């Protein structure tokens, strides 16, 4: 958040989903790795505005082949595109994972298909209750229509409904499992998870997706205790990116220390 700034390099108008207002600043897209015991930030990108109308201040001109040039070009791309780029870079660096977890903001069919086809990674994510249609029993239905047509599980089951669908986009398709669960904050409402690994159980899908909460804890720690927002107030885009990397390094040291002090049996796994 740089609401009072005017000359910050690559500064843009970004939508704050908490206050439901536009603010001046950046969106920090973060890729992290977790084994269920520890969370480590892997990479990030400070996203500016994809559209010129939302760009407040431009950036310095660099050769597009240089790191500074590539970083600025990346900041102007869509978050879904940058997410795939960060995952590809992490895999090229030797950082592997079994599943990619993300919320409904990134769960478009195109993104899920791209991760499976290009990166060979299965996805477990929250889905939007949008008009996006999926192949189900020979028909094209959205999640609301699928939910309304099926009988729900009763009692204290961890999920309400589980169905197999086909995620389709641009002539390509991918089998997936949709798991409908109760919304704890609104008992009459429901949420839907998707997994492209249809071999695992519904309980396992719910358990694995719960690990995504680690990144929310990470954001809270960085903002509240590691001075992510207020320590650096300069105008250089490169310096801001470096500051974020320093904050991430601080969190990594804390994460390793916590692992060694609290869970001796997992030291050799890190």
Question: Which role does the model predict for each range below?
Answer:
Residues 59-185, 265-269:
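An internal, acidic/charged active-site-proximal segment
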